[in-house]
Amino acid sequence: MFTVNNVRASSEEDLYAHLMAQLDRMLHFGTTVAEVKSGYGLDLESEVKMLRVIRRAELSHEITVVANYLPAHSVVPGHTAASMAQDIVTRQIPAIKALKDQGVINPLLIDVFCEKGIFEVEETRAILEAGRSIGLRPNLHIEELKHLGSGVMAAEQQALGVSHLEHLDTEGIAALAQAGTVGIALPSTQYLLHLPPAPVRQMIDSGMPVALASDYNPNAPCLSLPLIMHLGCVNLGLTMAEALVACTLNAAASLGKSETYGSIEVGKAGDLVLVKAPSWEHLIYQMGDAPIDVVVKAGRVAATPRH
């Protein structure tokens, strides 16, 4: 609860300044579209505060910000998982809808930390269904610490993306591949928590698109997608080409943004990263010192990290 208590005690201005500083750093690492989650308020007032901050960043920062509402990140003192899920479904989500309709906040996604002993499958399903009823699309944590069989449920809920996945099984992979859900591996978290690798090769071989993400949070404070791609190759067994697609087109698809972002095509946003190196592979190969020369956002130079 350390981070939750600090978020609850922080002013909106402090949170906004912190978020904008992190987005600035992400831009210099080549990120032009970022999912930003709530999830460290865990009561309605504090979650709304976080979502207001994310909305302000969406309107003011050069990075395209996609807000993910994460009301069920942990069970807070005074609640059981069941009572917290009930409160989220009956009280919090209707309030989120009202504020979204007013334009005060703009979450597009909904997330639950679906894990044994925290929010299990039925509680997660109820929260996702309530979120979907107000137009939020599921993009959630599953199968990180223990196998729970949540992959099939996520597929049934038409999740855009599912993340962590270290204990995802064959049945879950098949269901998610059939649903077109993107599997989001988080190699920095896997590395720092000494978790088994997500079964990305089996996912790819089964036709399930794989994305990579930083999972930037207090337990995995990494903002560098070039480093994430490096870890994806070394620790998860991706090829460099697979890692690049995972951090671009498939990542955009996990946010419902692949029609506009994620590849260089006529009609898409002009977001580019120019690398000063003999070949693009040096973006991944040069561990911790990616040779990013220019970051272009919507056809305009947004950052020049090496100048």
Question: Where are the regions a protein language model picked out?
Answer:
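Short aromatic-centered micro-motifs
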Residues: 295
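Active-site flanking residues adjacent to catalytic metal/cofactor-binding acidic residues
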Residues: 36, 140, 212-214, 270
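Metal-coordinating catalytic core of metallo-dependent amide/deamination hydrolases
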Residues: 3-18, 24, 32-148
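Active-site-adjacent C-terminal substructures of enzyme catalytic domains
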Residues: 137-138, 147-260, 275-277, 287-289, ...
